[in-house]
Amino acid sequence: MSKHYFCTLLMCLMFVVGAEAQQFTDIGADLTGLSEGSARWIDTDRDGDLDAVVMGEFFKGNQRGVQSNLYNNLRNDRFSRVSSGLPNLHRGDFSVGDYNLDGIDDIALIGETADGTRMATIYRGTAVGQFQPTGINFVPVRDGSIRFGDYDGDGDLDVLLTGESKAGPVSMVYRNDRNNTFVPVETRLQGVRRGVGIWYDYNLDGYPDIFITGADASGNPFSMLYTNQGIGFEEYQAGIIALKHSYAAVGDYDNDGDLDLLVMGEAAQSRLVTRLYRNDRGRGFSRTNAPFVHVRSGFADWGDFDGDGDVDLLISGESSEGPVTRVYENNRAGRFSDLSANLIGLHMSTGQWGDYDMDGDLDILIAGMASGYQYHNKIYRNDLLLAAQASPSTARGAESETDIFNNSVVVPERGKPDFLFVYSSAYTDLYNTGTKAYFLFISPVKRPRKQYEMEDRYNKLLRETYPQWSIIDQGNLLSIGKPTQAEAIKSRQRVIDEYASKQFTILEINW
């Protein structure tokens, strides 16, 4: 995610599935291959499933192009490109959030058009799933990042921006004063390009701090954590390695209640580095010995792909041996293992975990450039649940390595469990008290009459009950089905007990 980690507990997997049975399948979504851009999941049409927005550069023959594409999720592994209203950009980034509090996701974006014009602005989401310009203008940049986040705790989303302006690298915070008004905040942040700036509440005080990494005006690698003091940001010397062509992702890999920091990029002497720093409860950071591939010019995202209650790592970029994309399984106690997922190796890449097929596990959206200047944009379906439900001979049968990436694979329609419940989680100031807390939102057990009926009803009631839902830092919407009502009720209670043990407040979305 991104930037966030997912509170994902698939309690329906109460048995062990061998690593050889875990696989990701290229669904052959026929998306335009792009690089040097950004790819994110977003539910633009608000129908309860994840659509995809991907922006970047591509070549077709000798013709160069720049696109920002919206793909509508038609379900059953089918996506259709639709009109979005977004400008075509590359060398950019975008962030999803409801800046105007109207209950519809908007997009903040930066980048460069095909004619070299740089821009940084917000496009407002509409009820029909398209986007419209707002006239909001930030310092135009390319080769950077943009992130929504409520740094001042006033209930609306502010903006953190980094990148290369015409005057050089910048890093800026814009305060949201509502009514389409954003005001630049005096922060004295180091300007960077070819890197990223992220909101990161490392000290758990409820106010997002800032981590910035990238190349400074002289091209030197830079990394710094800035503590949110309420009236400004102050440098915090955390000992994080200086990097450029870099990326950062936070997630609680050790399940101790604070967010740890992963950084990747190019250090001094052109050395490629990927490091995981353990957050020692806001009192400092400890470097770990996690065995991740060293990369630059890529991305990383934390997510619990195997549903065992801890976050795993998706990472992609340029290694010393060429483009790579890997999934590392979190084996706890600080140990990770390469899943050997056989995903396409990419650099100048972007992507994110997300459950596009709503089957309760995390799938992968990824775009970038492979060896030989080949542009790709793929969706990989997580078949962990399918493998777990199959017999050992089926799950580990005669499929070759290439079989699971066959773009012509016929995907069966999602099954219809007899009894189902759905749930999601969030860390937020739900009641506008000034204090954030962890919440679990869970439905009753029902017997759906058609596919996705539960998810659709749940989403509708959740938005009606909690209007700020679209701006909340959410976990995935998960669904669990059981053949009998008794089993489903037992599974639901197990989920509630697990989250309650982690001090989540349980909120029932009933109908």
Predicted regions and their residues:
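Bacterial N-terminal signal peptides
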Residues: 8-16
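Blade-edge motifs of beta-propeller repeat domains
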Residues: 21-34, 71-89, 124-141, 175-192, ...
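Beta-propeller blade termini
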Residues: 37-46, 92-101, 143-151, 195-204, ...
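Glycine-aliphatic tripeptides that mark coil-to-beta-strand junctions in extracellular
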Residues: 48-54, 103-105, 155-161, 206-208, ...
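Short glycine/acidic-enriched loop and turn motifs that connect beta-strands
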Residues: 57-62, 112-116, 164-168, 215-219, ...
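A short, exposed loop/beta-hairpin motif centered on an aromatic-Gly-Thr core
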Residues: 442-446, 472-486
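A short, charged, amphipathic alpha-helix used as a generic interaction element across diverse proteins
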Residues: 483-500
